[in-house]
Amino acid sequence: MKHLWFFLLLVAAPRWVLSQVQLQESGPGLVKPSETLSLTCTVSGGSVSSGSYYWSWIRQPPGKGLEWIGYIYYSGSTNYNPSLKSRVTISVDTSKNQFSLKLSSVTAADTAVYYCAR
């Protein structure tokens, strides 16, 4: 029982510490092939202008693992997954405390659950 409690505390503590910052994705649920997927992530309880973090987009295709799409720093500098780089744009709007993802020319291979992350 002691081991179980230790495990639970170890897992739960980081979530409690970080719970003040929340990220909420918004955008269309469906996009037609060849169109552009546009998603926005709104940050609450923190600021995208914080110089301590990179703001990321990741996705998880059905039945597969997580795939990193890219990240942006508050200054606007970006880094993208090489396999998606030609189709991806990530931008930040510090006035709205948001960052956004645009993925152009989508195909069935882009079917996934998309997440924003810090």
UniProtKB/Swiss-Prot annotation:
Q: Where is this region: Framework-2?
A: 55-71
- Gene, per the UniProt record: IGHV4-61
Q: Where in the cell is it found?
A: Secreted; Cell membrane
Record's keyword annotation contains Protein biosynthesis:
no
Please tell me the species this chain comes from. Homo sapiens (Human)
The protein in question is named: Immunoglobulin heavy variable 4-61
- Tell me the InterPro entries matching this sequence: Ig-like_dom (IPR007110), Ig-like_dom_sf (IPR036179), Ig-like_fold (IPR013783), Ig_V-set (IPR013106), IgHV (IPR050199)
- Highest rank taxon of the organism: Eukaryota
**Role noted for this protein:** V region of the variable domain of immunoglobulin heavy chains that participates in the antigen recognition. Immunoglobulins, also known as antibodies, are membrane-bound or secreted glycoproteins produced by B lymphocytes. In the recognition phase of humoral immunity, the membrane-bound immunoglobulins serve as receptors which, upon binding of a specific antigen, trigger the clonal expansion and differentiation of B lymphocytes into immunoglobulins-secreting plasma cells.
Gene3D superfamilies recorded for this chain?
A: Immunoglobulins
